[in-house]
């Protein structure tokens, strides 16, 4: 492991690879307990999470629903609730995957909010977008979509006295692959410190189908490049990112991309600048 790999892994609190099935189950139990502790400390009984159809939100939701199920069983209090939220922009091209996720999760409640009217209304009122290039406007509006989704989740959480769950994990965090104050905003992040293959392993341990576990990850925020794979945006694969974070050798080109991207996106992982 090179020094910079160790530095980054420590900063992101990267967890070691699962040694065996028992280690995986122990990590699942630890993260479920973490979610339960967050609710207890906040003195709240509701969790809210947006479901995209990808493995990250699927895995976070499975952990959340298990935590809620355990709390109800332990306390006899039926007020404990997990709310899964669908947040499509008009018609989502992989809606079938989102619905398949919901079937696996078996959430207590499912809410649906079409974010398109809010996103379009805001974009239409922002003068700074009027003269931007199509590519720039598409990118900026893509971030508006992510932030609008989080606004919707916090609106539901506010109405129901709940906490919002985020889906960030180490493989996305190292690349800064999230929208600041969008999907990067949450009250608790139960996948934090995991690499991508660990997220998949946890989903698999819950019995999630391989079609969802191994689905090609995509943020799917930009209209000009619908369904663009995360790895195309990264310039490296998740396998390379995972290997880097676990201190394993990666080719020099991938190494350089990961380190440069980590440094460039440092501001996204920190609190706002202050004097």
UniProtKB/Swiss-Prot annotation:
Mg(2+) binds at residues 56, 172. Keywords: ATP-binding, Ligase, Magnesium, Metal-binding, NAD, Nucleotide-binding. It comes from the Bacteria. InterPro entries: NAD/GMP_synthase (IPR022310), NAD_synthase (IPR003694), NH(3)-dep_NAD(+)_synth (IPR022926), Rossmann-like_a/b/a_fold (IPR014729). It catalyses: deamido-NAD(+) + NH4(+) + ATP = AMP + diphosphate + NAD(+) + H(+). GO terms for molecular function: ATP binding; glutaminase activity; metal ion binding; NAD+ synthase (glutamine-hydrolyzing) activity; NAD+ synthase activity. Its EC number is 6.3.1.5. GO terms for cellular component: cytoplasm. Deamido-NAD(+) binds at residues 147, 180, 187, 267-268. It is an enzyme of class 6 (ligase). One of its GO terms (biological process) is NAD biosynthetic process. ATP binds at residues 50-57, 167, 196, 218. Pathway: Cofactor biosynthesis; NAD(+) biosynthesis; NAD(+) from deamido-NAD(+) (ammonia route): step 1/1. Homodimer. Belongs to the NAD synthetase family. HAMAP family: NadE_ammonia_dep (MF_00193). Catalyzes the ATP-dependent amidation of deamido-NAD to form NAD. Uses ammonia as a nitrogen source. This is NH(3)-dependent NAD(+) synthetase. The gene is nadE.
């Amino acid at each position: 492991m090179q020094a910079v790999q160790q530095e980054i892994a420590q900063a992101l609190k990267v967890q070691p690879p699962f040694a065996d099935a028992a280690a995986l189950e122990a990590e699942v139990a630890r993260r479920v307990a973490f979610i339960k502790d967050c609710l207890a400390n906040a003195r709240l009984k509701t969790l809210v999470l947006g479901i995209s159809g990808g493995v990250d939100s699927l895995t976070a939701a499975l952990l959340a629903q298990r935590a809620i199920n355990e709390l109800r069983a332990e306390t006899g209090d039926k007020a404990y609730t997990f709310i899964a939220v669908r947040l499509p922009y008009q018609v989502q091209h992989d809606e079938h995957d989102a619905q398949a996720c919901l079937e696996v999760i078996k959430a207590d409640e499912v809410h649906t909010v079409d974010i398109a009217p809010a996103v379009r209304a805001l974009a239409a009122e922002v003068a700074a977008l009027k003269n931007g290039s199509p590519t720039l406007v598409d990118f900026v509006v893509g971030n508006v979509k992510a932030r609008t989704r989080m606004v919707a989740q916090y609106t539901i959480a506010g109405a129901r006295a709940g906490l919002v769950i985020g889906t960030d994990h180490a493989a996305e965090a190292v690349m800064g692959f999230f929208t600041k104050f969008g999907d990067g905003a949450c009250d608790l992040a139960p996948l934090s410190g995991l690499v991508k293959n660990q997220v998949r392993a946890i989903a698999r341990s819950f019995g999630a189908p391989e079609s969802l576990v191994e689905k090609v990850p995509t943020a799917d925020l930009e209209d000009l490049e619908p369904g663009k794979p995360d790895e195309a945006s990264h310039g490296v694969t998740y396998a390379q990112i995972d290997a880097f974070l676990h201190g394993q050798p990666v080719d020099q080109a991938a190494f350089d991309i990961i380190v440069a991207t980590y440094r460039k996106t440092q501001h996204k992982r920190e609190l706002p600048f202050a004097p």
